[in-house]
């Protein structure tokens, strides 16, 4: 199959990478796993056993007229322990390489079908100027975009840093969430070739 390149000849690409059927269930599983892996999971509270304080009974069991109490670390006391204390958790989910690559291929194929993948010969800036980048995107009739290049161009990265709806990644930095988060995905010819090599 062929991908149209802006201002250049069409690029022949592999149908297994850019012409794959849309697999919603697989994409959902991989996106959920990716988001789960990004969770910090470091929350921690103390149970009554872990709270610092005496284990002595505050007053005798009977005869005072007060409610019975075992120690000052009881969860119903101020500064006592937490009943079901949260502990650090690993939220990551296992996704094997075949599934991950399949999801990326499925997303790329759907971007092609929806005309959301814009292929350009090259995409670089002479200086880190946001104004120049905005104009370049206007020329492509794009506002909300993920820009994928073969290697990270520092000028491009710095120019895009101040734009809320624009992100710049190299091929190694793409992930399923960022691919579906933007209206358009601008990708260079060299980046397309790299993606094909990685996903082959």
UniProtKB/Swiss-Prot annotation:
Keywords annotated in UniProt: Antibiotic resistance, Repressor, Ribonucleoprotein, Ribosomal protein, RNA-binding, rRNA-binding, Transcription, Transcription regulation, Transcription termination, Translation regulation
Please give the Pfam families that the UniProt record associates with this protein: Ribosomal_L4
One GO CC term on file: ribosome
Give the result of residue 65 to D, as annotated. Answer: In strain: S27 and S47; confers macrolide resistance
Record bears the keyword Cell membrane: no
NCBIfam families reported in the protein's UniProt record: rplD_bact (TIGR03953)
According to the UniProt record, where is the region Disordered? Answer: 43-67
**How does the record describe its quaternary structure?**
Part of the 50S ribosomal subunit.
Extract the PANTHER family matched here: 50S RIBOSOMAL PROTEIN L4 (PTHR10746), LARGE RIBOSOMAL SUBUNIT PROTEIN UL4M (PTHR10746:SF6)
Give disulfide pairs as residue numbers.
none
GO biological process per UniProt? DNA-templated transcription termination; regulation of translation; response to antibiotic; translation
Q: What does this protein do?
A: One of the primary rRNA binding proteins, this protein initially binds near the 5'-end of the 23S rRNA. It is important during the early stages of 50S assembly. It makes multiple contacts with different domains of the 23S rRNA in the assembled 50S subunit and ribosome. Protein L4 is a both a transcriptional repressor and a translational repressor protein. It regulates transcription of the S10 operon (to which L4 belongs) by causing premature termination of transcription within the S10 leader. L4 controls the translation of the S10 operon by binding to its mRNA.
What does the similarity note say?
A: Belongs to the universal ribosomal protein uL4 family.
**Name recorded for this polypeptide:** Large ribosomal subunit protein uL4
Which one of the record's GO molecular function terms can you name? rRNA binding
Q: What is the effect of changing residue 82 to I?
A: In strain: S54; confers macrolide resistance
Transmembrane segments annotated in the record for this chain:
none
- Organism of this sequence: Haemophilus influenzae (strain ATCC 51907 / DSM 11121 / KW20 / Rd)
């Amino acid at each position: 199959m062929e991908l149209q390149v802006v201002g250049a000849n069409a690029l022949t690409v592999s149908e297994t990478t850019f012409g794959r059927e849309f697999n919603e269930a697989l994409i959902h599983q991989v996106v959920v796993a990716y988001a789960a892996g990004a969770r910090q999971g470091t929350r921690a509270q103390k149970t009554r056993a872990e709270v610092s304080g005496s284990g002595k009974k505050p007053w005798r069991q009977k005869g005072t007229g007060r409610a019975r109490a075992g120690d000052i670390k009881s969860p119903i006391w101020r500064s006592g322990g937490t009943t079901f204390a949260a502990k650090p958790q690993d939220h990551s989910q296992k996704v094997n390489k075949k599934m991950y690559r399949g999801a990326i291929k499925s997303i790329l194929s759907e971007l092609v079908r929806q005309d959301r993948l814009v292929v350009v010969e090259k995409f670089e800036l002479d200086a880190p100027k946001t104004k120049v980048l905005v104009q370049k995107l206007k020329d492509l009739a794009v506002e909300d975009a993920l820009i994928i290049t073969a290697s990270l161009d520092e000028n491009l990265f710095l120019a895009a840093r101040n734009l809320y709806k624009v992100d710049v990644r190299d091929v190694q930095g793409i992930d399923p969430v960022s691919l579906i988060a933007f209206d358009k995905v601008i990708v260079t010819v060299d980046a397309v070739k790299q993606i094909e090599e990685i996903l082959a």
